[in-house]
Amino acid sequence: VKVSRKAAYQEGSSIYLQEGERISLEDLLYGVMLASGNDAAVAVAEHISGSVEEFAELMNKKARETGALNSNFRNPSGLPDPEHYSTAYDQAMIMRYALKNKIFARITATKNKTISWEGNDWGRGLRNHNKLLWLYPDTTGGKTGYTRAAGRCLVASAKRNGREVVAVVLNCPDDWLDVQNLMDYGLDNFKEVKVVEKGDIIYWIDWKESREGSLGLLVENPVYVVIPVGGKLKVTREIILKPELELPVKKGDIIGQLKISKDGRLLGDTNLIAGNDLNYNSIFLRFLHWVTNLTKNRKKGIDGE
């Protein structure tokens, strides 16, 4: 990545990039995550999208995909902007999504890192601003943030006995202590419960036009939800089938989704797959289907000429 003048002269925290310097994308990511380098964040944005503005659009699109629906990003560094905002819940959704990326998980858990420094015989020594990596043994990662407008902000994650939680505090003077208390509360007072198991048949669809007569809906992957210790599990299951679903269906085809929610809030989902083949119940219908497909394919060929 070649560092632009705009990136090199970013205000706020910095890893002291120089205009024209060349540095790897991975080193820049360490600079962003460990040292809160605003210059590194802009260099990444310009490398990926060509401009901060275009990168912010990608940020907003990805945020919505993670479930962060009440955020709007205008820059990659978090510097104040009237139209740049987020919520604690949204930050938790983004962190949960990011932790699934192995590269991100490795970087955010790193305490110290030396990255390249072009033109010098030594590298840049980075120390993670996230003190929880030293204070709280179960910490798996996190990101600090501070501006006068936002105050002290912290997103952090911790894992214990196979369960991982994310805690977020915004404008919080006692961020280190409060996040530790939140993570203790989440790890000690909640448990993970399996709602459906992989391979479970959760419903049968009657299909009179088929030879088999019915189609079993199988769960592709298990779905877990988190509930309070001692609490009862009351969730809503919603089956959403593909609108274009038609015969024939092959065993193993993805035919829809199962969504698990509570009080309108999505807790988890998984694909539904066909548990059996589903074929036409007569030679005539099979022939009609073959002719229809042949006609469609011929039309595509004519349209493409």
Where are these regions (language model features)?
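Active-site-adjacent loops and short helices of periplasmic peptidoglycan-processing enzymes
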Residues: 1-89, 93-102
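Domain-terminus/edge residues, biased toward the C-terminal soluble/receptor-binding domains
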Residues: 69, 80-85, 89-305
